[in-house]
């Protein structure tokens, strides 16, 4: 595991030893690592120890909307993996597998929801703030829109979010809620 040696380039980026600048891919893209600075190596360590709820708790500190990212959106962490000369670790798929393992538990959806709102590993804000009295409308529910909505809710604001596309309810086997 890379974080024990301070080489978790997937989180912090792959740097040139001489200039300390980010290395670049063959296409000229900086290998800057995870834009959220997610604790990826720590998450994998918890997962391999069999603690997949702990692994998810570690991931959602920096990326509470891991359900919408994972292998679907970003792979900057893979581009910066120190195992470039071999096959890089498929970090986004590991995130997704960890989330699925938790969602398949009894009360799995509730566990994930709880970790995104009340997470004791999140030292900056382990619990949501009190109600602020503000009401916010978020238009557009792409990755930025639903992440903004989440953070606004944790800041104590009442949030209504709309999107141009039809939004389907989550499968009842995951949410426990029958529409």
Predicted regions, residues:
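Ferredoxin-type iron-sulfur electron-transfer modules and their immediate structural context
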Residues: 1-130
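N-terminal Rossmann-like FAD-binding beta1-loop-alpha1 element of flavoenzymes
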Residues: 134-160
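N-terminal FAD cofactor-binding segment of flavoenzymes
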Residues: 48-51, 174-179
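Short acidic, glycine/serine/threonine-rich loops at helix termini
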Residues: 95, 150-151, 171-174
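Glycine-rich FAD pyrophosphate-binding loop
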Residues: 157-177
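General N-terminal targeting signals
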Residues: 98, 106, 111, 143, ...
């Amino acid at each position: 595991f890379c974080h024990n040696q301070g080489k978790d380039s997937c989180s912090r980026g792959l740097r040139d030893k001489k200039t300390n600048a980010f290395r670049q891919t063959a296409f000229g893209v900086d290998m800057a690592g995870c834009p959220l600075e997610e604790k990826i190596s720590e998450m994998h360590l918890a997962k391999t120890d069999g603690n997949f709820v702990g692994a998810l708790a570690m991931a959602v500190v920096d990326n509470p909307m891991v359900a919408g990212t994972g292998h679907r959106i970003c792979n900057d962490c893979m581009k910066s993996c120190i195992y470039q000369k071999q096959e890089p670790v498929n970090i986004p798929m590991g995130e997704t597998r960890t989330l699925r393992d938790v969602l398949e538990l009894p009360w799995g959806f509730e566990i994930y929801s709880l970790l995104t709102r009340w997470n004791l590993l999140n030292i900056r804000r382990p619990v949501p703030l009190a109600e602020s009295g503000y009401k916010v409308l978020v238009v557009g529910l792409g990755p930025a829109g639903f992440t903004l909505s989440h953070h606004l809710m944790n800041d104590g604001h009442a949030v209504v979010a709309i999107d141009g596309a039809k939004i389907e309810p989550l499968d009842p086997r995951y949410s426990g809620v029958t529409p």
